[in-house]
Amino acid sequence: MTDKLTSLRQYTTVVADTGDIAAMKLYQPQDATTNPSLILNAAQIPEYRKLIDDAVAWAKQQSNDRAQQIVDATDKLAVNIGLEILKLVPGRISTEVDARLSYDTEASIAKAKRLIKLYNDAGISNDRILIKLASTWQGIRAAEQLEKEGINCNLTLLFSFAQARACAEAGVFLISPFVGRILDWYKANTDKKEYAPAEDPGVVSVSEIYQYYKEHGYETVVMGASFRNIGEILELAGCDRLTIAPALLKELAESEGAIERKLSYTGEVKARPARITESEFLWQHNQDPMAVDKLAEGIRKFAIDQEKLEKMIGDLL
């Protein structure tokens, strides 16, 4: 009998949400995603020590300024981990721009180009890389410009429909709407504590975004992210891609039985609305208290882990 992970792969491209190379070898995903928190976790793994040492040594060659060395080494470590992962996945690695730049379009573009250059210098072409940016107005504008220059982007920390619409209209390659963090908010802020998978507010959000994109012929890839249980994952079978943590990949692989496709669109393509303006985007996003809370929290958490990573690097310089 087939297992649920194999069955899911019939309908959806499976991506590993981890920086753990051992997990890549085990589950053989198409792509992989990382973020500052995952890079920080990966940096604690003994087998990665050589990647850290290489990043530190490289940074010392680039500058005599300690602050710049920390920035350079942190960027190089993220790319070094990405390079190791790319040896194991046939597709793309997503590497994230410093979350502290989430409200600065030009700085985000500059950092993205810096990361791309590090990959290119290591022999990796742009078609194997996605640059992750937070789905702020400024992040979306940065992605729009980068896409025009041949740098594909993954817009993350996406919680509101306004964010999803703006990303599609900007022509970004891929979005990562978060499922589990939406569920977390509703459990913490409403009286309802249990949800059937089909009623899970994170599942509903991704399903609505998927349908809207397909209805209007947007080519932006929808990649559901941040799962709390396999019920959420199975309810999104058919989504373009799903990025899944190793623990849930393991649970799927150990669960027997075929699954059914839940997301699909076979209808006609409808006319697209006029592009959302900045003021409309900000107002519509602000009307969703969950999205406001979780976007801000996500940026803060990634920034904290970026700073922890920089401190760890600084101690080695």
UniProtKB/Swiss-Prot annotation:
Catalytic class of the enzyme: transferase
pH note: Optimum pH is between 8.5 and 9.5.
Primary site of residence: cytoplasm
Pathway(s) per entry: Carbohydrate degradation; pentose phosphate pathway; D-glyceraldehyde 3-phosphate and beta-D-fructose 6-phosphate from D-ribose 5-phosphate and D-xylulose 5-phosphate (non-oxidative stage): step 2/3
EC number: 2.2.1.2
InterPro entries attached to this UniProt entry: Aldolase_TIM, TAL/FSA, Transaldolase_1, Transaldolase_AS
Any Pfam family matching the protein: TAL_FSA
GO molecular function, one term: transaldolase activity
Coiled-coil residue spans: none
PROSITE patterns: TRANSALDOLASE_1 (PS01054), TRANSALDOLASE_2 (PS00958)
Catalytic activity: D-sedoheptulose 7-phosphate + D-glyceraldehyde 3-phosphate = D-erythrose 4-phosphate + beta-D-fructose 6-phosphate
Record comment: activity regulation: Inhibited by Tris-HCl and phosphate buffer. Also competitively inhibited by sugars with L configuration at C2, such as D-arabinose-5-phosphate and L-glyceraldehyde.
GO biological process: carbohydrate metabolic process; pentose-phosphate shunt, non-oxidative branch
Active site residues of this protein: K132 (schiff-base intermediate with substrate)
Protein name, UniProt field: Transaldolase B
Gene (name only): talB
